[in-house]
Amino acid sequence: MPCFLPKITIFVPDHTDRNMKKAITLIFLTVLSVLNLSAAEIDSLFSRWEEATGMHRIRLGNELLSFGYDEGLVSEKKSYGRNQSIESEARIYDMMSYYFYINDKLDDALSTALIALPLCEKSGDEQLLGNCINNIGVFYQRKGLFGQAITYMERVYNLDLKAKDKSGMSSTMNSLATLYLATGQPETALSYVLPAIEMERELGDRERLAIRLGLASDIWLEMGQIEKARSCVDEAYKLDHEDKREGNAAIRLSQKASVLIALGEDIEAEKCLI
């Protein structure tokens, strides 16, 4: 599902394709320094908006939305109007939850996103709603609360299905597969990642395909299907190596080493790690 904020992907270093947190944070902080804005000033503006009423609340809301647009937190310049108060407030809370997340304030990010959720549901904007639910799922995962994360990611998946958004579906299925693998449910994980692989073959995104294949390799390995794990990781490495994604290729070699160790080929595994 396309989102006005970058769709955060479940963070597991070996698997995720859209974990943009570090890069976005660097860009974000660079812009802040140029504009001479401090995090404390932004937090203060948000707090004053929450406490304000009437026209003062609208004025502060417009300042927040303008800030979000200037910093790239929203893709369109929005105004806080009386007739769109629910949507405007949903957008502000959702935007600020992401702001807290990229500034490593995970508890604030989650609590703010949970405030945003009922507003997003009332707004009628399914793109905004999908973004909010996705973020909540990621925040729960980052806190190690995998059960709650799965609940929200399943909701995102249903919205992706409704929107017939194959790219979004693939990302969400990758996240769900990662979560189910982490909770000891490899068969369920496999049921998500295999269709995601076929979607990426159809879409032609070689980098995302390699990520899906790498995750599938880990799942097959967990299930004891060593040859299938090897086949997936070999294809993933080939894609990353040919496209000169050195960091990703190194991850694939690490995954391949795990497969080779399971096959008893310790010497070959050691070569992968050199």
Question: Model-flagged regions — what are they?
Answer:
Residues N62-S66, R91-I102, A113, Q127-R142, ...:
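Conserved alpha-helical positions within TPR/SEL1-like repeat arrays
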Residues E51-A52, R82-S85, L119-D125, L159-D165, ...:
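Short coil/turn linkers that connect adjacent helices within long alpha-helical scaffolds
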Residues L37-A40:
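Boundary at the C-terminal end of the N-terminal hydrophobic targeting segment
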Residues F46-W49, G61-N62, Y69, L73-G81, ...:
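Inward-facing hydrophobic residues that define packing positions of alpha-helical scaffold repeats
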Residues T25-V34:
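Bacterial N-terminal signal peptides
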Residues E76, Y80-N83, F100, C120, ...:
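Eukaryotic all-alpha helical interaction scaffolds
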